[in-house]
Amino acid sequence: SCCITYMFSKVMKERLEKEKLIYTSNTDELTRCLNRHAYENDMKKLNLSEEWVYISVDLNGLKRANDSYGHMAGDELICAAADCMRDSFHEYGKVYRIGGDEFAVIITENPNQVEELIHSFDSNVANWHGKFVDAMTVSYGWVFSTERNWGSAYEISKAADARMYQSKERYYKESGADRR
């Protein structure tokens, strides 16, 4: 009985350590979003014949916030963007931090609801107010996997990036904000 309890305890401890290692290797430490490692693995698994949506998201004015208020302000913005994405998209897909202020969202559940989800995201972003920075703006672009015949999931990501950069151009042109 004592041996069985010991063995059970040892197996459970090893399982928990393995789960923690997997979590750590796939999770961005700052935002708790999935990281680039998880993103690369998941991109390889996406089926181009199924309908899903790729959303490319980028913060506007992060450098300005870092330069004006310090890196704690920049981290606050990055974490806030991640929280807004998680709140809006997590039930329908996955949120990844793939670079400094670059995020990807892959919607696999009910992708036809993407405009509704984007509206929720816009609302979350508009209603956010931080400790160091008062407001946040983001640019994004999205692409349906079924828009045309794509060569790869990466081709879809590049198309979403292009739309996100168009959105970013519009933001800076309309707001008159400094691009730095």
Go through the PLM ranges and name each one.
Residues 94-97:
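A short pre-motif secondary-structure segment
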Residues 19-41, 57-71, 79:
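Conserved nucleotide-binding and Mg2+-coordinating catalytic segments in signaling enzymes
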Residues 73-92:
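Active-site-proximal alpha-helical element of nucleotidyl cyclase-like catalytic domains
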Residues 77, 104-121:
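Short helix/loop segment flanking the catalytic signature motif in cyclic-nucleotide metabolism enzymes
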Residues 67, 71, 115-122, 126, ...:
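Catalytic-core segments of nucleotide cyclases and related cyclic-nucleotide turnover enzymes
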Residues 134-139:
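PAS and PAS-like sensory/regulatory domains
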Residues 1-12:
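Membrane-embedded alpha-helical segments, specifically the hydrophobic cores
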